[in-house]
C-alpha cells in the first residue's frame, strides 16, 4: 500500500465520519423539535396540575408517560378534546390506561 492509497483511505474514512456526525446532529435536532412540539401541545391540552402529575409519572415510568402524552396529543389533533384536561380527568384517564394488577394469594398448608 502506497502513501497515496493510505491518504485516500484516510480521506474516505474522514468523510464517512463527518457524514455520520452530520446525520446524528440532524436526528438530534429532529428529536428536539418533536419534543418541543409535544410539550407545546401538552401545554395547550393540560392544566398546570395535570402537567405536573404527568411530569412526576415521567420520572418513574418514562415509557408509560410517553405513551400517555402521545395519546393525548392524538386525541387533541382529532378534535376529541374540547377543553383543557384537569388533574382529576387525567387521574381517571391514567386509571383506565394502567393495566390491572394481578393479585396472587399464597396459601400455606
From Swiss-Prot:
Keywords: DNA-binding. GO terms for molecular function: DNA binding. The keyword RNA-binding does not apply. Residues 14-35 are annotated as: Disordered. InterPro entries: DNA_bind_arc (IPR022889), PDCD5-like (IPR002836), PDCD5-like_sf (IPR036883). Gene3D superfamilies: PDCD5-like. One of its GO terms (cellular component) is cytosol. Residues 16-25 have a biased composition (Low complexity). Pfam families: dsDNA_bind. Belongs to the PDCD5 family. This is DNA-binding protein Mpal_0536. It comes from Methanosphaerula palustris (strain ATCC BAA-1556 / DSM 19958 / E1-9c).
Amino acid at each position: 500500500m502506497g502513501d497515496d492509497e493510505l491518504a485516500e483511505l484516510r480521506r474516505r474514512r474522514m468523510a464517512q465520519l463527518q457524514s455520520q456526525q452530520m446525520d446524528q446532529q440532524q436526528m438530534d435536532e429532529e428529536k428536539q423539535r418533536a419534543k418541543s412540539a409535544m410539550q407545546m401541545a401538552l401545554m395547550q391540552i393540560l392544566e398546570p396540575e395535570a402537567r405536573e402529575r404527568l411530569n412526576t409519572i415521567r420520572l418513574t415510568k418514562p415509557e408509560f408517560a410517553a405513551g400517555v402524552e402521545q395519546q393525548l396529543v392524538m386525541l387533541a389533533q382529532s378534535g376529541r378534546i374540547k377543553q383543557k384536561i384537569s388533574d382529576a380527568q387525567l387521574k381517571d384517564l391514567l386509571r383506565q390506561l394502567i393495566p390491572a394488577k394481578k393479585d396472587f394469594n399464597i396459601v400455606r398448608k
